[in-house]
Amino acid sequence: MGELHSVASAVTAVAAEAAEEGGKQNNFLIPNGTFFVVLAIFLIVLAVIGTFVVPPIQKVLKAREDMVTKTAEDNRNAAEQFTAAEADYKDELAKARGAATAVRDEARAEGRGILEDMRQRANAEATAVTETAAAELARQGEVTAGELATNVDSLSRTLAERVLGVSLSEPANAGRG
């Protein structure tokens, strides 16, 4: 700051001196003192800006560039991870579908086996019941046939007596033959 103040006072002094010399004729090809003073001020301002202003700006720009580079790299990595995860997901989904299909087919086959077993049991049970019923009917038929065979003689005698009107149980009639 002190340098700028001293430079500014030097510039005003040179400007005052040039104003006093204003009466003299100046050649525009020969530089006067103001040119060198303005050049010195320009170089000082340039040095101050280069020293105090440009490095922080460059630092911020570098940090932002690094941040953008890191973000782009992170995005690229995330895209690769997403692609890999999606491929894994599709593979696992295909495996799960295959497993589900296998389980479903196995369950259907097991169901068919159980159904066939139940049919065989029902058929065997029906056959057993039919055979038991047939045996029972045959037994009852034999019993009934035996009862009828024993009762046929007495029934036929009773019927003949009623039709003929004669008693066949008498001993005289029994001798006739």
From Swiss-Prot:
One of its GO terms (molecular function) is proton-transporting ATPase activity, rotational mechanism. GO terms for cellular component: plasma membrane; proton-transporting ATP synthase complex. The chain crosses the membrane at residues 35-55. It is a single-pass membrane protein. Pfam families: ATP-synt_B. The keyword Transferase does not apply. It comes from the Bacteria. The keyword Membrane applies. Keywords: ATP synthesis, Cell membrane, CF(0), Hydrogen ion transport, Ion transport, Membrane, Transmembrane, Transmembrane helix, Transport. It is found in: Cell membrane. F(1)F(0) ATP synthase produces ATP from ADP in the presence of a proton or sodium gradient. F-type ATPases consist of two structural domains, F(1) containing the extramembraneous catalytic core and F(0) containing the membrane proton channel, linked together by a central stalk and a peripheral stalk. During catalysis, ATP synthesis in the catalytic domain of F(1) is coupled via a rotary mechanism of the central stalk subunits to proton translocation. F-type ATPases have 2 components, F(1) - the catalytic core - and F(0) - the membrane proton channel. F(1) has five subunits: alpha(3), beta(3), gamma(1), delta(1), epsilon(1). F(0) has three main subunits: a(1), b(2) and c(10-14). The alpha and beta chains form an alternating ring which encloses part of the gamma chain. F(1) is attached to F(0) by a central stalk formed by the gamma and epsilon chains, while a peripheral stalk is formed by the delta and b chains. HAMAP family: ATP_synth_b_bprime. This is ATP synthase subunit b. It comes from Mycobacteroides abscessus (strain ATCC 19977 / DSM 44196 / CCUG 20993 / CIP 104536 / JCM 13569 / NCTC 13031 / TMC 1543 / L948). The gene is atpF.
